[in-house]
Amino acid sequence: MNASDTIAAVATAVAPGQGGIAVVRVSGPAAEATGRSVVHCPGRQVCGSHRVMYGHVIDGEGRRLDEVLLLLMRGPRSFTGEDVVEIHCHGGVVAVQQVLERVLAHPGVRRALPGEFSQRAVLNGRLDLTRAEAVSELVAARSRRAAELAMAGLDGGIQAKITALRERLLDQLTELEARVDFEEDLPPLDGDALLDGLQQVRQALLTLVADGERADALRSGLRVALVGRPNVGKSSLLNRLSRRERAIVTELPGTTRDLLESEIVLEGVPITLLDTAGIRSTDDAVEQLGIARSEEALATADVVLLVLDGHAGWTAEDAALLARIPEHIPRILVANKADLPAGALPQPVDVQLSALEGTGEEDLVQALLERCGAAGTEGVLLALNERQRDLAATAAAALGRSQEVAAQQLPWDFWTIDLREAIRALGEITGEELTEAVLDRVFSRFCIGK
């Protein structure tokens, strides 16, 4: 990446052709000249910073391609810290493509790489690394709770917390290094108090890691497969949970011949429900295809709901289906049709409910969230992503080693080795310790235009 280039991309999340307006963003030294060249603004409009101008995008022969608004933001008062131009055009596929092509045709302008706008914002001091990541997470949020946690990061919550912990460690390092160089001139250092301070930071980091792991489901969501023999009520349960008729519900076994999906949100956790075809032996070619897809869903699910007919009781088919579920995938045994007289269920079940009447639904929701480790996320205030958690765990491990050094009563300079490692890891979270490898890892996951 050459930071002196001028870059351009479509910045809006809505796919071309699906929104009334699209935004083409341009950033870099040639941004203003590009905007003035591509957009013709009639009358006596003043092309000033942070002012909106009206005009038309024109081609090389002077023909109008689209009616647009032009917004100029001169650096450093822009998202990237550079001169930025935004062209607000119509959202049709042709309109967006023509505007972007005209921009890219300007000398010195190239197409932006994934995440390059945000990367420039970090390099120019407009964002720290945690805020840049929060931008991506806010765009990708699939639930209000996920958006809340992303916004907490965008507001600087993670950066402030990590910076405060890092500064405490820097203070401790300063004390230790002073003792290494000038121990005879300074009063004795209270080693127990120092260890207590390091342990407080370590515990705070472990709490952040645990909270981030619990909140992971809010970001990525869960795939939940509903599995069971035909006519046990899987489709009725899908319709009950999704609050809309997604599956045809009849008394005929094998009605669901394909894999049906429904997107829902339970207590802030995005969940994809997969209503599988009843897995059984059949000569029907279409049903066989649905069963094959069901088995694929079974292997890739985060959790499996094995739906039983609580009225008919436990059968050999139920036992065979239970054996098909991979050992590493959590499973919940759900006895449906609790509104009817109960049959024999020698196999202990986790939840009894009636998909028809809705009884037991809350028990199922809680069992699902607990089995996936997603329960209790309402208490999470800051959610570190995987990269941030790895670094926080590295820092916590380094601080744990410092306790071992203390137990061995080694000299102060031995303490500084692990302390420096913890400080480096925390600095990498926020971007205080910034390398090209860190930037590549973070921004390669971004979409073009962010």
From Swiss-Prot:
Q: How is the cofactor bound?
A: Binds 1 potassium ion per subunit.
UniProt keywords (A-Z) are: Cytoplasm, GTP-binding, Hydrolase, Magnesium, Metal-binding, Nucleotide-binding, Potassium, tRNA processing
Q: What is its main location?
A: cytoplasm
What range(s) does the TrmE-type G domain occupy? 221-373
Which residues does Mg(2+) bind? S235, T256
Location within or outside the cell: Cytoplasm
Q: Where is the signal peptide?
A: none
InterPro entries reported in the protein's UniProt record: G_TrmE, GTP-bd, GTP-bd_TrmE_N, GTPase_MnmE, MnmE_dom2, MnmE_helical, P-loop_NTPase, Small_GTP-bd
Which cofactor is recorded for it? K(+)
Molecular function per GO = GTP binding; GTPase activity; metal ion binding
* General function of this protein: Exhibits a very high intrinsic GTPase hydrolysis rate. Involved in the addition of a carboxymethylaminomethyl (cmnm) group at the wobble position (U34) of certain tRNAs, forming tRNA-cmnm(5)s(2)U34.
User: In its UniProt entry, what is this protein called?
Assistant: tRNA modification GTPase MnmE
GN (gene name) = mnmE
